[in-house]
Amino acid sequence: MAANGSPLSATGDYGAKTSREAAQTARRTTRAGPEPFGDPLSGILLVAEPAAGAANARVVDALRRSLATVKLVEAYVTWIHSDLLEEILSLEPGALVAVGPAAARAIDSLDYPLARMAFSEVPEGSWFAWTKGASGLRLPALAPALEDEDAKRHFWRAFLALRALAPEEAAGRL
């Protein structure tokens, strides 16, 4: 029951459960990277590899700007950490994106029980069926793209695959 006495909808129940589990995981987790950002209920989860030292702030800023460019500002971004499996299980994303080879290896090492394909086995920038209900996308590392023009072009070519998840794009496919 909601606080006003009316019954909760199934969507409301699920949203509350997922929000609570994500908050519990975040409180318990010792993170090596920056704080996660975005909406954990967006259905889009990016797992990024932290950059070395002060470059973390630049990577966070670049990810925020890049997501805004493809109209996915609500996508949830987290970093490689010890409770990543629990976080993925609680969020149940429809799209899971590995940003960088270390993120791809970290996801693969979780031995996710329903995974059909390993992130490390797919080409960068190509969507694949990660589980029956979730798509996966592997991207190059972002930190090198902040320093090198060729790496930047390579990152962007792969990153633009995320446009398929933008609300206008999704509506256009219906």
Name the predicted role of every residue range.
Residues 1-174:
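A polyanion-binding, active-site-adjacent surface
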